[in-house]
Every structure is written in structure tokens, then in C-alpha cells.
Amino acid sequence: DRCLSRGLGDVYKRQRYDIYGDHMNRNIALTGKPSPNLKNVEEQEILDTIFYGSGRVEAEDKIIVPEGQEARKVAAQAMREAFEAADGHDYSDKSDAEMLDAIVYNVFPNFSPWGGFPRNLIYRFRPNGTREDSAIMEAMFLQRNHKDPDKQEEYEPVPIHYLSEDENWDDAEELTGIGFIFDQDMGNIPEVERGIRASKSGKLTYANYQESRLRHYHQTMDKYIAKGPLKP
């Protein structure tokens, strides 16, 4: 939407895709630069979008972009200071990209860890029995412990929260406010599947660049299928 587009690179000019061998690829989505589709976006609007989800925030304690500086630089430094205050680690030599950008690695066949230093999301996908029209998606958080041993916490194993088909991701309190993004991302899956099955040729045509990761995975799967069954 327009609000998020103020601070997120939402089109191909603001995203990068990399492929590493047969079993890993990466997506980097730039944060702190507006969508090229929007014109005349002020730096303060960009920073407000990053931290507050809105392009115009009226609050006495909000972070201000100094005259002549870029929101991306200011936001990255604010993140460094916040992380150091939270866990005691030194982030002064970490890049702006590691502080802000959405960096996602896909490791074949079913593992997707986020990179960078914010609290990291991990995705894992597994078969749902023998159903070809269903799968299990797991979302987990990883977070660094405090650098000071005296301040480190003993973490107990977290029980799995299974969502029913009638629940939304946003119903999971464990996702601490980002579940609605999952719900938005998954809202079009039924239409995507119908479109796939409606192909008259029975084949799929991938976009040259933005869907290169999908093509990469299918090429790897084809290589394994061509080898035939594994021999004991």
C-alpha cells in the first residue's frame, strides 16, 4: 500500500535476487528508500514509515531526521543503538543493510532464514501428510542473548502454537504484531493456485527476474527427479 511504499522498495528496482549453486538463493528488499512509483517523498515521511508504520506521525518523542541527512542512515544508526542497549553487543561496524533490510535466504528444499541483526524470522515448510494441495508452514523467531553472561536468560522451549483453518496469523500473539503481514501475503494464494491450474498449456511461465528463485528451485527439483529413486 502507499503508506508502506514510502519506506520500502516494493518493485524490482529496489530488490535484488541472488542464486548460489543448486541449493540456496537470496532476496534483499531495500528499506529506507521509497518506491520509485512515489514522487516527492520527504525523508521524515520515510523514517516515520519505518518505525511507526505511517508516513506522518505527530509525537514529541519520535526520531527526527536532521536537515540534510537521509532517513535510511538515521534509521540504521537508531537500530544499532537500540540493539546494543538491548543485548550489549557492539553493532558499530555492521552495515545499514544488516540493520534494516529484509534479507531472506531460501535453503533447498524447505528452510528460509532471515539474515541481518534484527530479531530473525525462520520459515520451515513440511508436507501435510500426503495432501498435494496443502502444506505446513512454521514461523519461528531467533534472538541473540545478552553479551554479558550475568544478564543472559535461560530460555525454556516454546510450545508450538498450531493455527486452525479458521484462525489468522495475526491471532498468534507469539508473532508480536507482524502476523497481519503474513495474512496479507497469503490472501492471494487461492487466486494464485487457481491461476496455475487454469493454464491451458499446462505449463508455467516465470518472470525473468522477480521469479528467478522459483525457477531455480524447480530446476534443482528436476535434477533430483532425473536421477531416479535413491538406491539403498
Locations of the language-model features?
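Single conserved hydrophobic/aromatic residue that forms the stacking wall/gate
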Residues: D1-Y12
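Polyanion-binding catalytic cores of nucleic-acid enzymes and NTP/SAM-utilizing transferases
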Residues: D10-D93
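Generic detector of well-ordered alpha-helical segments enriched in charged/polar residues
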Residues: N25, D48, R80, E156, ...
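Substrate-recognition/cap regions that form aromatic- and gly/pro-loop-enriched pockets
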Residues: F83-I178, D185, I189-P190
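C-terminal active-site-capping segments
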Residues: I196-P232
